[in-house]
Amino acid sequence: PGITYSVDKASMYSTKFQLAQIMGVYSADMAYSVLNKQSNEGQMYLKTVREVGNKLNLSKVFDQGNLFDRFNANMENEDSIGTIVADIQYATDNQLAENQQNELYGVIFAGAWIESMYIAGEVYKKEGNENVVQALFEQMAVLNSIITELKAYETKDPGITPLIAQLNSLQAQFDALPSVKKLDENPDLDFSDVKPEKGEMDPLIKTIGDIRAAIVKG
């Protein structure tokens, strides 16, 4: 509670870039709510994702296969909800391609990834669970793929270049961590083999919070 982004702010965003980012943010909030058995919040976030998606000409996503109704009917079934969320993702990707809006895929993905990382960081700050830090550390492996996706469409929207710059800065900060350097020195190790030292991820968590603040500011 209090970590996810308020649905009341959804109407603040108007450009395609802003809407794509915030759709990603709300998608991550929806997933977090579902994982934490917060049914009402999950339904509220799905409704908001759909409303934002409609503004991006993605209304067909939720009409296909009764995704919206299926989600609401299966809130208590974790396996079913996982499948439905994956179906929503797949339908969104297909609709973006059909609409020739491929540049928005990376923007939505970046918004969702940053929000997920932000939530994990906030949970860690409150609870001090080192397993959360490990999960954050391992999820950083995804960042290069997001940056590559955004670069492929950089000329399509003026908002993409500053987002790439922020993510590149985060990547550089991560690469400078002692634990990451240990990975570089030992090619046989992967992310799950290395545990960051206590406090090592704190500056990174702050940077993630700063990027999230920039995203929700629009």
Regions found by a protein language model. Name each.
Residues 30-37, 56, 95-99, 120-128, ...:
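Secondary-structure edge/capping motif, primarily at the C-terminal ends of alpha-helices
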Residues 77-160:
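Extended amphipathic alpha-helical interaction segments
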Residues 49-52, 56, 120, 139, ...:
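Alpha-helical solenoid scaffolds that mediate protein-protein interactions
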Residues 4-11, 98, 198, 202, ...:
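Immediate post-signal-peptide N-terminus of mature secreted/exported proteins
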Residues 43-48, 68, 107-108, 133-137, ...:
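Short, charged, amphipathic alpha-helical segments
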Residues 152-218:
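A cross-kingdom marker for long, charged
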Residues 1-73:
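N-terminal Sec/ER secretory leader and immediately downstream segment
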